[in-house]
Swiss-Prot record:
Disruption phenotype: Mutants have a C1-defective and methanol-sensitive phenotype. It holds the Pfam family DHFR_1. One of its GO terms (molecular function) is dihydrofolate reductase activity. It comes from the Bacteria. This is Dihydromethanopterin reductase. Homodimer. NADP(+) binds at residues 9, 16-21, 52-54, 93-97. Pathway: Cofactor biosynthesis; 5,6,7,8-tetrahydromethanopterin biosynthesis.
């Protein structure tokens, strides 16, 4: 069985994104910095698959310590996952990607951050049971 996981952070009410970025991007509060550090530590040496916007936000240094694959929601997910036999695969998002890959994810690593501001993208709890609540 392929080891497929999701790693993401959400705000207090499930906020995921705002204007194409993390709503808390650039926040230097130690809890936010710790979450970013943890993301890079957990994915190090593994595969990170994500949509183009998510991959575009990954700093250049991160490409040397993990395999990063830009995927599209229309790609066959089973074919994508088969590219990495024996590897741990993290699905990094965004929403269109999670809508497709939710049914393959065996472990959800979700960090709730102390952000309670605005957002235009939200975490869908239906992903936790294998599918999108809304299409």
């Amino acid at each position: 069985m392929i080891d497929v996981r999701c790693i993401c952070a959400i705000g207090q009410r499930g906020q995921l994104g705002l204007n194409g970025h993390l709503p808390w991007e650039g926040n230097t509060d130690p809890l936010f910095v710790e979450d970013v550090t943890r993301f890079f530590a957990l994915t190090m040496g593994h595969v990170l698959i994500a949509g183009p916007k998510t991959v575009a936000s990954v700093p250049e240094f991160a490409f040397k310590d993990r395999t990063i694959d830009v995927i599209r929601s229309h790609e066959d997910p089973e074919a994508v996952l088969k590219r990495y036999p024996g590897r741990r695969i993290f699905v990094g998002g965004g929403i269109a990607v999670w809508n497709v890959y939710a049914k393959y994810i065996q472990h959800w690593d979700v960090t709730r951050l102390p952000y309670d501001g605005e957002a235009d993208r939200w975490f869908d709890p239906a992903w936790l049971v294998g599918g999108p609540l809304r299409s």
